[in-house]
Amino acid sequence: AILREPLAVSGDFQNDWDFVVAFYYPSYADMVEKRTAFRSRTGGAEGYRLRDVADCGDRIRINNVWFALESSGGPIPEVAPSMALNCELNGLSLSRAISNAGNIRNFLGSEVRQAFVINRMFGGPSMPQNSQVGYRAIFNSSDGFAEAVDRITDNIQPPNPDNPQTCNVGSLWADHLIFARDN
């Protein structure tokens, strides 16, 4: 599980939310099993519970996540910078968007730890199905992130006529590892 702290986030995110907690499951069956067990458990708790300090309200979203670029190895950092873009597909297929994301390490450099494509399945504001994707790149270190941003600004690319996507201004996050399990 990752707690995402917004550092410089586009849109109205910071007006509405303080942070995001992201849970990753290998399948919907695994998610249903674990979330059902979590909701069914009984008993007390000592100290604060999440609901004592945070309210999710109607904002829960369930996304499909495709790991376009697996981990570059080594231990997962406790805090890692990440960048995210939300893009309109404008006719580009979801499978092509996922395939394109596999090249992100070539574009951003070797310090990209992981890259994935996010597509909303349930919740959040209404929108046409498979019309948008999010791209997220997580870096091994702050220095690696800085090198990637320098690479982007030093190598501005012209629009690709074969890629109809349009993307919003990116967002910068600090990803805090709060739990990891290899299941």
What spans do the regions from the language model cover?
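Acidic/polar, glycine-enriched structural segments that form the non-catalytic walls/loops
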Residues: 48
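Short S/T/G/P-rich N-terminal loop/turn motif that feeds into the first structured element of a domain
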Residues: 1-41, 52-183
